[in-house]
Regions:
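Residue-level signal for short hydrophobic patches within transmembrane helices
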Residues: 20, 24-43, 47, 70-77, ...
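Helix-terminus/linker motif at the lipid-water interface of multi-pass membrane proteins
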Residues: 43-62, 131-138, 194-201, 261-294, ...
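Interfacial/gating helices of multi-pass transporter permease domains
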Residues: 52-72, 138-143, 203-204, 245-252, ...
């Protein structure tokens, strides 16, 4: 039985055949819906920010936007596990082990529920201490705490969506998660407008709308898994934690999650420094950050594409195909990100004004866009090379190098360069500086590992 027969044809199972045929078209068909999903999700999140900023004021905008690093800090470890799920299932598909794939799917969904409940409890309990630790201004603290506690009620839904979407990605399906986000996002925007503008619920209305939308997206992804491709079909009654799969998922996913957590810690430190400039700076930074997310999600989509294509082809021992997938993802990811960043920066005042009418907040947003957004494409050097290593099972290496290059250097910057020149512009320069360092480290490690793997 040849590899194609082992892994079942794409036509028969309605899954993408990543092991055979031209790569570029398949990579774009995989990555672009994935990028669209993330960008669409961010558009809906941005709607939260825009509605609050326009109809509730700068304090409410600061309360919602200032929470972003905190939320990322608490969920990144567990979202990292979904990366492990993608790699493990992808490897089993590449090896043609159908029963292992099915076991992994039910293990993944059980882990999603457990992680979600854990986050709900931790996020609710630690909301106030964390917000106080990052110097959240007194006038913003009550609103920020209210938003965070309501937001974390939806964590089980967030985890189910992310883990379920990872399962679908492992078979090349990036379209149905997009459909789930379209539906949930429209619901989110409608609820935002009603709860904030009509019922005057301020940040609580935005948080409630987000929780309901998260519930919808999780329900849809679960439905897709229960009725879709037989190989990854999900039956809630069969949910269990298989030791072998749990260990493999944690081995791949935990370093990625740990990287995300430490990354978020450094961003929380930067957010604390931003908070020191006052409410206007927090609001302006939050506005600019939304555009960084739009561009970063393109890079992240090609990162996940690299992980998935590499995991399947590495499992099938097609190393040259792994190399080609990496090159295509790197070039296309950085090119698209660069074009998007340039457009946002060219019309920076207009885009900043979408989220706030406050002139001082817009000034801060413009500074961040010029110093950070314009160079966002540099993140591709470490994200995509790190994705290639994870696809081959080397998850710890990119995690450690990113911690050293990005996180360690950012904290060092805050206590050295920023101390000497404590301006908002100098604070923002920490981002591109760390991207250059981390990109050199992770790319170098990838080339070394690739050479060693090829020599085996």
């Amino acid at each position: 039985m040849n590899i194609k027969e082992k892994n079942m044809s794409a036509q028969k199972n309605k899954q993408m055949d990543m092991l055979n045929g031209p790569l570029l078209k398949k990579i774009l068909f995989f990555a672009l819906p994935l990028a669209a999903s993330s960008i669409l999700q961010q558009l809906f999140n941005s709607a939260d920010v825009a509605v609050v900023g326009r109809f509730a004021g700068s304090k409410s905008l600061a309360a919602v936007g200032g929470n972003t690093p905190v939320i990322s800090l608490l969920i990144n470890l567990f979202v990292g596990l979904s990366v492990g799920a993608n790699v493990v299932i992808g490897n089993y598909i590449g090896q043609g082990k159908k029963e292992k794939v099915k076991e992994s799917v039910h293990t993944v969904m059980a882990m999603a529920v457990i992680c979600g409940v854990f986050l709900l409890i931790i996020g609710t309990v630690l909301a106030r201490p964390i917000l106080m630790a990052i110097n959240t201004p007194d006038e913003v603290l009550p609103l920020a705490m209210l938003y965070l506690r309501i937001y974390f009620v939806g964590m089980p839904f967030v985890m189910v969506y992310n883990f379920g979407a990872a399962v679908l990605r492992s078979i090349g399906d990036t379209k149905r998660p997009l459909y789930a986000l379209i539906v949930s996002g429209i619901i989110n925007i409608c609820l935002n407008l009603v709860l904030v503008i009509v019922f005057k619920l301020d940040v609580a209305g935005v948080a409630i709308a987000t929780v309901i939308a998260d519930c919808v997206s999780a329900s849809l992804v679960t439905y897709f898994l229960m009725t879709g491709d037989e190989m990854v079909r999900f039956n809630p009654k069969k949910m269990s934690l298989k030791k072998e799969q749990v260990i493999k998922i944690i081995k791949i996913g935990a370093p990625a999650g740990l990287q995300g957590v430490v990354f978020s810690v450094s961003n929380v430190c930067i957010q604390s420094a931003i908070n020191g400039f006052g409410t206007k700076a927090i609001a302006g930074s939050s506005a600019a950050l939304n555009y960084e997310y739009f561009t970063y999600y393109v890079i992240n989509a090609f990162n996940q594409t690299t992980v998935t294509f590499t995991s399947q082809n590495y499992g099938a021992k097609k190393l040259e195909r792994c190399k080609k997938a990496f090159r295509l993802c790197l070039v296309w990811g950085m090119a698209i990100t660069g074009i998007m960043s340039l457009i946002f920066v060219l019309f920076k005042e207009f885009f900043a004004g979408v989220y706030t009418a406050d002139s001082q907040a817009i000034d801060y947003a413009v500074i961040r866009m010029v110093h950070v957004l314009l160079l966002e494409l540099l993140t591709g050097t470490y994200e995509i090379s790190g994705g290639a290593m994870r696809g081959m099972g080397y998850s710890l290496v990119p995690a450690l190098l990113t911690v050293v290059g990005c996180c360690g250097f950012r904290v060092a910057w805050l206590y050295t360069v920023f101390k000497i020149c404590p301006t908002f512009s100098m604070l923002m320069n920490v981002y591109p500086a760390t991207w250059v360092i981390t990109g050199a480290l992770v790319m170098g490690a990838y080339l070394i590992i690739r050479r060693r793997v090829s020599d085996k």
